[in-house]
Amino acid sequence: MAEEPIRLTQYSHGAGUGCKISPKVLGTILQSQLDKFIDPNLLVGNETADDAAVYDIGNGIGIISTTDFFMPIVDDPFDFGRIAAANALSDVFAMGGKPIMAIAILGFPVNKLPAEVAQKIVEGGRFACQQAGIALAGGHSIDSPEPIFGLAVTGTVSTEQVKKNASAQAGCELFLTKPLGIGVLTTAEKKGLLKVEHQNLARDVMCQINLIGAQFSQLADVTAMTDVTGFGLLGHLSEICQGSNVRAEVNSAEIHTLDGVKDYIAQGAVPGGTNRNFDSYGHLISAMSDEQKAILCDPQTSGGLLIAVRPQAVEKVQQIAKQANIPLFRVGRLLEADTMKPLIEVI
């Protein structure tokens, strides 16, 4: 009798970026009674919820440093490693930089799962690093109750091309490079609702590395860029709005989702992270339908890049995406701040 295949998602209580601590709780954790340490060379810290830290080392060069890790969102070990690595690498591209090396972060239940499973996870991470043109140069591992994997990534960026949450401008158009609904599809799979024709849809999107960010960063008219992950589209957009003192309009009719997402929402395949996200920033958003909330607050894992583009550069950005065979979905626009209106208006 053949052994049952190992299903990694059965060994964790959370999945992918849905494991992230909610924005509200994270805000409490990051409060400090200590005087702020001022370093004039630290160009980007954690004040504006950016994707990575950036340090000026001189001669117009910034060093990017970031880390990201989570529990399995798929059952296959190799795919889990690929997705976790792609997700971590994305932070560097979202800042407008290029990665130069990575080290692995591995937590593994050595008494529950064979070492060969961990080997496949790391191999998946190594594969993604090679796709990004860098080495997986080392790492650290611990014995943990649940599988955890991710990377700490180092990158470089021109200090004049850093894309910050605080640099967006009113009048910019908003674009996203991947469809939404990853959290919904992975939840549908856990619930046994996923149709055969929708298998691997989410996996394939999560494995795509956001290499295109390095090209977008060359354009001064791309004023801000971030990746959409565990806080959902509205959560990460709210970080841009708050950091840049602007507000946003999101056109729900223009939002692209993975096939089947709306049907699975109707069947109750909404991850717990969706409500945690809404509880954290829902007061900043205009009224939405339940379906809109389930899509726009859906926690993404290795999601797309959200970019703010001045109108005169929209055609150029679309051309870059087309040449790279990357989808580019218009999702809304940025407007002048107005304290009498919601930070983000969903229409």
Curated annotation (Swiss-Prot):
It catalyses: hydrogenselenide + ATP + H2O = selenophosphate + AMP + phosphate + 2 H(+). It is an enzyme of class 2 (transferase). ATP binds at K20, T48, A49, D50, D68, D91, G139, H140, S141. Homodimer. It comes from the Bacteria. Belongs to the selenophosphate synthase 1 family. Class I subfamily. One of its GO terms (molecular function) is selenide, water dikinase activity. Binds 1 Mg(2+) ion per monomer. Pfam families: AIRS, AIRS_C. Its EC number is 2.7.9.3. Synthesizes selenophosphate from selenide and ATP. The active site is at U17. Keywords: ATP-binding, Kinase, Magnesium, Metal-binding, Nucleotide-binding, Selenium, Selenocysteine, Transferase. The record marks K20 as: Important for catalytic activity. PANTHER family: INACTIVE SELENIDE, WATER DIKINASE-LIKE PROTEIN-RELATED (PTHR10256:SF0), SELENIDE, WATER DIKINASE (PTHR10256). This is Selenide, water dikinase. Its cofactor is Mg(2+). GO terms for cellular component: cytoplasm. One of its GO terms (biological process) is selenocysteine biosynthetic process. Mg(2+) binds at D51, D91, D227.
